[in-house]
Amino acid sequence: MKVLCYGVRDVELPIFEACNKEFGYDIKCVPDYLNTKETAEMAAGFDAVILRGNCFANKQNLDIYKKLGVKYILTRTAGTDHIDKEYAKELGFPMAFVPRYSPNAIAELAVTQAMMLLRHTAYTTSRTAKKNFKVDAFMFSKEVRNCTVGVVGLGRIGRVAAQIFHGMGATVIGEDVFEIKGIEDYCTQVSLDEVLEKSDIITIHAPYIKENGAVVTRDFLKKMKDGAILVNCARGQLVDTEAVIEAVESGKLGGYGCDVLDGEASVFGKDLEGQKLENPLFEKLVDLYPRVLITPHLGSYTDEAVKNMVEVSYQNLKDLAETGDCPNKIK
């Protein structure tokens, strides 16, 4: 079976090849994202495509796939918003996704961003890179063991983040719509209002549910402690970007770290150095560095996470091809 894998970076290629030894697919990995007619036409002669985030299987591209004879559409992501699922079903495409992969990858990045903001390391190293070795008042910080950390969303990633913060000595509290068992040793589950009221650092690990809209709103931010740090390594749509900008500018937020943006496809994966960003909110966020830290959706950009995503995607394809079904089928 011939498989086209989109958005594969050079460092990931050995993982795609190593994982394929078990499956024996005829794979071609390209760095391109599925975002134009031309990139869709790359699938000519292939039986299946494996997408990643910011690859858009919209009506235009799905029609091209159908015309080219592509049989299966897979995404090596937990999110599936980049696929027009209803139209793909109309065209008869079996689809599958990767519901989970290394939770440590995303949790570690969230903790890293929080600690960079807490200890002001981005600010400090940007100065020392210019040979300014003075220590100023902005560099002064609390120790994390003297902080309360709030985790919004106690799924697999949120629980790992809670464990890491607990291991560093922080008092960890968390909120989830479900009662979570087995976390008592490292996290106390409380209401969202209590998380907002008490936390010096809040890290978001909730799923995005379109019908519910953003979680981080002006009201959410208003309830937070003055000067608290907020981190979002979950979904860009969970955050009202304009409200966050206002909170950072006013000093309500001590800092904001994110690995995701609402509408990130317009900037992530592109070198826009020296250019004015089309989205004025993104331009404002960038200008707020080092109080705002942005990473370009690389939470899953680790050895273990990529291995998990590729292995599950290959297995999904095998299951769909052999049985027409798989545990991770998009229905």
Swiss-Prot record:
UniProt: NAD(+) binding residues: 156-157, 176, 206-207, 212, 233-235, 259
EC number: 1.1.1.399
Catalytic activity reported: (R)-2-hydroxyglutarate + NAD(+) = 2-oxoglutarate + NADH + H(+)
InterPro entries noted in UniProt: D-isomer_2_OHA_DH_cat_dom (IPR006139), D-isomer_DH_CS (IPR029753), D-isomer_DH_NAD-bd (IPR006140), NAD(P)-bd_dom_sf (IPR036291)
Enzyme class: oxidoreductase
This protein's record includes keyword NAD: yes
UniProt keyword list: NAD, Oxidoreductase
Active site as annotated: 235, 264, 297 (proton donor)
Keyword Oxidoreductase in record: yes
GO terms of molecular function: D-lactate dehydrogenase activity; NAD binding
Known role: Catalyzes the reduction of 2-oxoglutarate to 2-hydroxyglutarate.
Family stated for the protein in its record: Belongs to the D-isomer specific 2-hydroxyacid dehydrogenase family.
Stated name of the protein: (R)-2-hydroxyglutarate dehydrogenase
Species in which this protein is naturally found: Acidaminococcus fermentans (strain ATCC 25085 / DSM 20731 / CCUG 9996 / CIP 106432 / VR4)
Gene encoding the protein: hgdH
